[in-house]
């Protein structure tokens, strides 16, 4: 959905692609975490390609520019179903009609825990190698109990965006959107999704350490209550709860002057007044990965697709089309245009992404490793969200 799609087309397309999209960079490795999941064997060898592969994907991930060449090379016809939300992706994958999904972190754990996807044999995916950026390997959202379930596609941070005409001094903290005395009260943009609760948790991790939050997606009942209380206070200062199709106009129209955003949306304003920063407290973010259905009807074509789209050239095409950092860092060396894109999205800057907690599905087994308490689930977050907005 980018390169760079005109507004409002870009924002509308982005809405389909990221509404609910992919968590954890900072401290969110799956190392040592054990969660009970269905025992599904992974493929040991590849066979002959089937005639097709059926894919559920965000808009912009499966396009003729690269899908047609894949079909010519493999004989696998690509059948695409565009999904608008992670919830829709989960529902579609549970029908058994699709082989692959471009899952985000707020969907992937649901698919893994419920046995909807199978672990992957990365030896059968040659392009899943050293060129895949380290920060997109072994993360909670697609790796569990030592098994890889997802082949990374791309990532991005939820940055703090601001209008330099109004916010004259570059902010370095999320305090400008959370504290009651913010000079920008009434002009603050907030993301309209239950997963935004994690943004409040990130701020509380830094400002109220006594709450004991170690992972913004692992909140017990009291920690969730604290995050919801902060969100309710913020509600009094919010100008708009945005989705990707309204974010750009909220800023360009002057309704909002500061708030959470995505780098691709900032660029979509085509206005240098709007700048961004990754605040000192860190941030949430999103990351997407290909996942294979537990009972895929076309697994060989699916493996071929995962390998093909993990090459530097094709992964880079997807990243530029969508507006995100590519998973294959080798893309950044292919051309001046590729390098510029990678620089814009901090593609290979692991120090940058070490401060980002990529979206992950909150589940009752605490993702921070605690055993003495039950954590809140995404259903709990979904139930709490309407109380925030009033």
Locate the predicted segments by residue:
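A ligand-binding cleft/hinge motif common to bilobed small-molecule-binding domains
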Residues: 107-112, 258-273
